[in-house]
Amino acid sequence: VKNYLSLTELNSALALRDLTDPAAGTHAMQLLLADAVSALERLWDIPSETHRLNPLVATADNYDRLGYSPGDVTRDSRYSRHVSPTVMLRSHTSAGIPALLDSLRGEQGLYDRLHVLPGLVYRRDAVDRTHVGAPHQVDLWRLKARGLLGPADLQSMMAAVVEAVLPAADHPGVQWRSTPSTHSYTAAGRQLDVLVTLPDGRNEWLELAECGLVAAPVLRSSGLDPRRWAGLALGMGLDRAVMLRKGIDDIRLLRSENPEIRAQLLDLARYRPVSLMPAVRRDLSLVLADSAEADVELLGDRARGALGTDADVLAALEIKAVTPTAELPPAAVDRLRMDPGDVNVLLRLVLQPLDRTLTDEQANRLRDRVYVALHRGKVQELIAG
């Protein structure tokens, strides 16, 4: 079953500022992207071409022409944002690749160029310090006619990207690794991770990019002969890359309107923390139709939608417990007027504005808006006055 975006949801998605686009003003993300692109231009001594494409794409370009199977879970409306049976908001910047490959069909001679496809992608995602519903990505594809590209080229591409994102001069001792990874549009696919130190001192591997050799079927579907054409493909999340480079621990800061924070997002210097307002927590007891609805990505997406322009106040949404009717005390079932198949979900909201203090009353009103959007039960428990 497909859930299509309403016109309001679509307009609000399309109105969101793309931080990779200089047309809306300077942002650190553009500087980081420029560093990565120029590093690869130097590595290979080839020109680059940047494509800023409409985020509304043919579903076939987002999935089928990149080799995704018809039953792939990522197609589900629970995770992707469909506008109609054949059109969606792209879930990755790779959606622009099939049309790009089509445009190369007439190239007869030598060809070697880096294609850069940056922009917003649209997901339904969890709410926490590292996830938003519309993150930024870039696809970096080197396409070459009359020449081979192999795993050694991919390895040097990964090394150049790591050095561009986390230059050794500022990040001495940076460690990275690549592990095998399967993508429908690459062969010899790799996942690129960097080792980061968390605020509590622990080390953790974080994914920076996914990459691989361009798969022959993807070339073939655009009429390019894989015996003549070869390619390297790398996709990177730019929000995470900027956060790693600048030492930012909350993804919401990248869009902050707070002048103290905003001024620090014009360069790639290390972020100097600005004291944030205290976090306010609100716990909700929801009745949902079944346990499949108790999905942190699904609930996070609905909560963001309910809050609209206030969504940036929601720092985290956590599921604390999921209990079927049969396991609840009869008094609770009675009070909530639950049906046999229902589940009770205890949900915690963490509300923390980046630029103002939240009164209890304001927090209660935000809590109620989320509650009304998520709760499926017969009895409502609202707390705002």
Predicted regions and their residues:
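Class II aminoacyl-tRNA synthetase-like tRNA-binding/catalytic domains
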Residues: 1-131, 142-143, 205-219, 228-230, ...
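Short histidine-centered catalytic/ligand-binding loop motif
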Residues: 19-25, 138-152, 282-292, 359
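Amphipathic alpha-helical segments
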Residues: 29-44, 140, 153-169, 298-302
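Short secondary-structure junctions
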Residues: 40-46, 109-111, 164-174, 305-317, ...
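Long, charged, glycine-rich C-terminal linkers/tails
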Residues: 45-61, 172-183, 315-318
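Short, solvent-exposed loop/turn segments at the edges of secondary structure
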Residues: 84, 133-137, 187
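Extended C-terminal subregions enriched in glycine
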Residues: 151-155, 160-190
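A carboxyl-terminal module marker
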Residues: 179-200, 206-385
